[in-house]
């Protein structure tokens, strides 16, 4: 993952997700952390995309919180955070989708779409909330008006 390829907003989301993982004393940076942060964005872009894709953003938010509460916590140690394999796949998928679309940077929309495709537990949360990857991609195109 090369953060230079990410928009400022996407960088901030990644950093906030890492901070969330550390604050909750989780040893791994998982896709659920990123989904939680995206769902809490002030302007509600992720929530709006999930709704536009036919999903239930409130259910996704509740389910991701449940998933995070089930993650093992560690105490002591160096506060080292490890990248979960699913998270690495999410970043790779977001970068590939951005490149394919001709985007200059990886955006939060592409991160959300990648979570729905590659996000492990976050993928399951989004699917249970009714947010399918292809529908999210269509919602992204609609919001961007093809840009």
Question: In which residue ranges do the predicted regions lie?
Answer:
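Histone-fold recognition with a strong bias for associated Lys/Arg-rich disordered tails
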Residues: 1-147
